Amino acid sequence: DIVVAKVSASFIQAFSKIGLIPDSGGTFTLPRLIGMQRASALMMMGDKVSATDAQNMGMIYKVFADDVYEAEVQKIALQLAQMPTYGLALTKKALNQTFNNTLEAQLELEDVLQTMAGNSEDYKEGTSAFLEKRMPVFKGK
């Protein structure tokens, strides 16, 4: 869901250099991440992409120095764990349908999921914490 990389990481679609095509869903995923033109060029040319360039293209969320990578990943995991995970799960459900749905169907799904989120204990806790000027304590419910 959230893709991060070490600054030393690189990415390559080298299939074209040996007469093959990208597989394992590469022709499906990469164009959706970075656009058809850029994906076509990377897949046909077989260029190596640095982690920083991958971030700039939208392939990954963040790049961390190698020596702090593990600590930064732990920070992200902790931050997510302390968030309203029920709402995050509903967000993921909506995102999973975005390329399959029409705009109308996606708006209907968002309406259903937003109603579910709005009836959650986490939403009540989040709004109470905001009004009381305190940090929320979410339970994933």
Residues of each region from the PLM?
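Short C-terminal tail/terminal secondary-structure segment
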Residues: 99, 135-141
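Bacterial helix-turn-helix/winged-helix DNA-binding modules and their immediately adjacent linkers
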Residues: 73, 102-106
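Helix-loop "lid/cap" segments that line or gate small-molecule binding pockets
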Residues: 42-43, 94-98, 113-118
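Crotonase-fold acyl-CoA enzyme core
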Residues: 1-88, 119-120, 125-128, 134
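Glycine- (often His-adjacent) and acidic-residue-rich active-site loop
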Residues: 17-19, 98-102
